[in-house]
Amino acid sequence: MPQKIVVVGAGPVGSLAALYAAVRGHDVEIYELRSDLRNSEHSSNISQSINLALSERGINSLRKTGLPDLADAVLAETFPMHGRMIHVRKHGQYVRQAQAYDAHGRNLLAMDRTGLNKTLLDHLNSMPNVTFFFHRKLVSVDFRKKLAWFENRTKTDPAKSDDIEVSFDLMIGADGAHSAVRYHLMKFVPMSYQQEYIDKLWCQFHVPPSDKGDFRIPPNYLHIWPQDDAMFIALPNLDKSFTSTLFLTRSGFEELVASGKVVEYFDEKFPGVVPELITEDELRKQFNEHDHFPLISIKCSPYHFGSTGVIVGDSAHAMVPFYGQGMNAGLEDVRVLFEILDKYPGDQAKALSEYSEQRTPDAQTINDLALGNYREMASDVKKPLYLLRKWIEEKLYIYVPSAGWATQYSRVTFSNMRYSEVQAAAQRQAKILNGIVGVTTLSLIGSAALWLGRTGGLQQAKQNILRSICLLAQQAQKVTKG
């Protein structure tokens, strides 16, 4: 039976939730605090956001809407990234090192968040059972009476701000990390809540195309300048520019603001950026004019109340951007939610309860993995032991497929396996991998004399490593299949 579904938040996650509901024949109303981002007047307010890395979970959620052209329309606006490109100095020389994302050649897709949002909104706009309400601020909700009150904040008539009463059968909160829906949900359900601002701020920079209209650096990579307590990244855009982001401690930003030595800092920490990618004047200008945003991590539980309210995306589990899964996880929330709602067509309360029970451990797992992945991106990627472990894992992935071996990264990024199950599998694999790394390290040491003493020694070392992997494959199979 068709219901009235109110979605609060018209970002990508809220828009996808509205599409899933509309395709099922429900009457959908979307309430958004801001103006319609498709209007030119809004463009100046949305220019700063960390670019998306769209991966399998997000793509799968787009395909499962029931709209055959949606995923293709989104994918047409993406740019493939084969792996990471690490920018470092070695022995005083600036070098770039490519690290593939996947042993089987699968890619991440760089995408502008606003472009994704516009595509979703355009599809919603063509559906007769969907109504938009922009400049509407949620001020109160009664989830028992199924009533909500919104303040009309239209710019055309600021004085006209009387609250508007709205009824609903189900409210879906997709209104971000500082969610008003979550705030009001807490009044009806004993919700556990944890919020953490990590000691990192971020600032966006724009790298324009070259004078010849081409990319300034190889385009099919996520470029990383790792510096332990700081990191600079760059993602490609379709117009051959890059969207770049500086991550730095709060005190680090304060020191740069006070000293004004942002160019000197980049020269020291991030080789090849100034003036090759950004001129000195433009770097100073963007650093001073662009906001320095905080990074927040949020966990809460449960995600619902009875049969009438549920939260998705950042409203439920805001995470730091270091695994590239925030948006993908939010889109996956929508798919999982509606699959469970379809499972219990006559019992919405049971469906929402199962959604909270299933999705909470998964969301909290990727939240933790995202926090931990900063170290990998900003530090580990330049260390020999990390590269050795990565090489071994990829060889196991290729040569022992019967063991079900896969890297944690590939399972997170290129599969739809539950995040909590990914972590459990990774922990089982780590037990055997630690042993393989130990054997491999001894093999490397034992082969060092051969490598130094005669031609072919390095190849012999690699053969010894692969032999060690094969000998341990049977044990790996037992462990990973648990």
Swiss-Prot record:
Query: By its UniProt entry, which Gene3D superfamilies does this protein fall under?
Result: FAD/NAD(P)-binding domain
Q: Which domain of life is it from?
A: Eukaryota
**Localization of this protein:** Mitochondrion outer membrane
Molecular functions (GO terms): FAD binding; kynurenine 3-monooxygenase activity
> What biological-process GO terms show up in the record?
'de novo' NAD biosynthetic process from L-tryptophan; anthranilate metabolic process; kynurenine metabolic process; L-tryptophan catabolic process; quinolinate biosynthetic process
Copy the pathway line from the protein's UniProt record.
Answer: Cofactor biosynthesis; NAD(+) biosynthesis; quinolinate from L-kynurenine: step 1/3
What InterPro entries does this protein's entry cite? Answer: FAD-bd (IPR002938), FAD/NAD-bd_sf (IPR036188), Kynurenine_monooxygenase (IPR027545)
**Disulfide pairs?**
none
EC no.? 1.14.13.9
Pfam families on file? FAD_binding_3 (PF01494)
Which keywords does UniProt give here?
FAD, Flavoprotein, Membrane, Mitochondrion, Mitochondrion outer membrane, Monooxygenase, NADP, Oxidoreductase, Pyridine nucleotide biosynthesis
The protein's annotated catalytic reaction(s) are: L-kynurenine + NADPH + O2 + H(+) = 3-hydroxy-L-kynurenine + NADP(+) + H2O
Which cofactor does this sequence's record say it needs? FAD
Q: Name one GO cellular component term.
A: mitochondrial outer membrane
Question: What exactly does this protein do?
Answer: Catalyzes the hydroxylation of L-kynurenine (L-Kyn) to form 3-hydroxy-L-kynurenine (L-3OHKyn). Required for synthesis of quinolinic acid.
Q: Which family does it belong to?
A: Belongs to the aromatic-ring hydroxylase family. KMO subfamily.
- The molecule here is called Kynurenine 3-monooxygenase
Species whose genome carries this gene: Phaeosphaeria nodorum (strain SN15 / ATCC MYA-4574 / FGSC 10173)
